[in-house]
Amino acid sequence: MKSENYAVALVVLAGGKSARYKGNKLLSEHPISALSLIQHSVGEVVSARNDLALTSELPITVVTGKWHDSVNTQLKHSLCKVSELPISIVHNANWDEGLASSIRTGLTHLLSLSSLSKSVSPTAKGLCTRPTHVLFTLADLPSLNAQDFVHLINTSYANPNHIV
């Protein structure tokens, strides 16, 4: 999927407090992959990005909150080393303000990364450094897989002026 007019950034929201779970649910084991839920969720996003050969140099952004240290450790010791794609782990210090605060943190991070680039046009590799679209997903949705993300991104690509 290469287009000068379309570049999607991927943001995984992992900043909740897991109040009903009574602990860090993102470290619980995924029933199928046997990975921690955070490893599984980010892994599916990485797979979708790789499947589509997305046109963005931006890393996948993972926004953490209350459980930043343990989530950061899980990802640093697994997916970040395996994936050729960089993964940015960003701590939302205001996680207790709710989901909107994590979305804001993710967008602020994306804007800071893309502001380092002087143009919206693709690089020599044909990759965009500024997103035209952002896909947000929650880290605690164990049934979502790479194909679900591929479908959402393809639908967005086909309908770039609509929210998907």
Show where each model-derived region lies:
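N-terminal glycine-rich phosphate-binding loop and ensuing alpha1 helix
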Residues: K2-D69
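Hydrophobic/aromatic residues located in beta-strands of well-ordered beta-sheets
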Residues: L10, P59-V62, I89, V134, ...
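Short glycine-rich anion-binding loops that position phosphate/pyrophosphate groups of nucleotides
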Residues: G16-S18, W67, W95, A139-P142
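A generic structural signal for alpha->beta connector loops
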Residues: N24, S56-E57, E84-P86, P160-N161
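Intrinsically disordered, low-complexity terminal tails and inter-domain linkers enriched
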Residues: I32, S47-S56, H77-L85, L111-R130
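Acidic helix N-cap motif at the loop->helix transition within catalytic regions
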Residues: D69-H77
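Conserved donor nucleotide-binding strand/loop of the catalytic core
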Residues: S83-E97
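Conserved beta-loop-beta/alpha segment of the NTase-like Rossmann-fold superfamily
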Residues: E97-V164
